Amino acid sequence: MPPNCHIPALGCPIDRSHPEIEMQVTMPNLKPEGNSMPDLPVLDLPLIEGTPASLAGYGEVVSDPKRQKIEIVRWPAQGWRPVDANSGDEGGTTEGIFACQWVGDVLKAQNHAVGGDYVLGWSCLPSQASEGNSTLGRHRALMWRANYHPDGGQMFFPLEPAPFVVPLALPGDDVTPQDFKAFWFDGSKGLYLHPNVWHDGVFPATDTGRYFGRQGRVHARVSANFPNEFGCYLGAPLPRESAF
């Protein structure tokens, strides 16, 4: 952790004078072992029902995945000459199953659209996590990182009707843990995220979750690491029943 970072503040920015921390941000290990993670405070996120109104600015509720448009961002010009109007956004989309599974206290995921393999979080402090029986009753997921895609949007649509939660924050590189909210869905509809919206993956309230995914094929990823940058984890509630 950077020097002079006071953990209780939950808001200490990264000190980029430390090259080892810079490496963790630019080249993250997306499958960290729990025993390699520090014991830190947890910032519990507010839980909000995912509706068209609450998702304004973040994305959209998806009723029909076949008809959902995926935004593709045109490649940015490097100088005063513009990118030709019929170019720079022709990479298209890629699709596949986003599969999540709780293995004891550890939430693992694979994004078959882009070949991603992740540890999304833990149901307790990662140093205490077991891949056998759950250490504690699973009532929340501790999230350790987030990212956004500047090249395009992303869709998740449940293949089985079960509740899930997606933590989100609005675009901006100066994001803080306090900017995040946890959006709850009952599993009857899906979620589309605009480009540049901070997210990680899907956090199922049940043992497993499978979601049809579609996103920009370029798959640029800009990341934030909460333990390294802010000295905390984000706690996403995982209720199985609606509280709204």
Report the location of each language-model feature:
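Compact, glycine/acidic-enriched structural inserts
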Residues: 232-234
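Conserved metal-binding segment of the jelly-roll/cupin
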Residues: 184-198
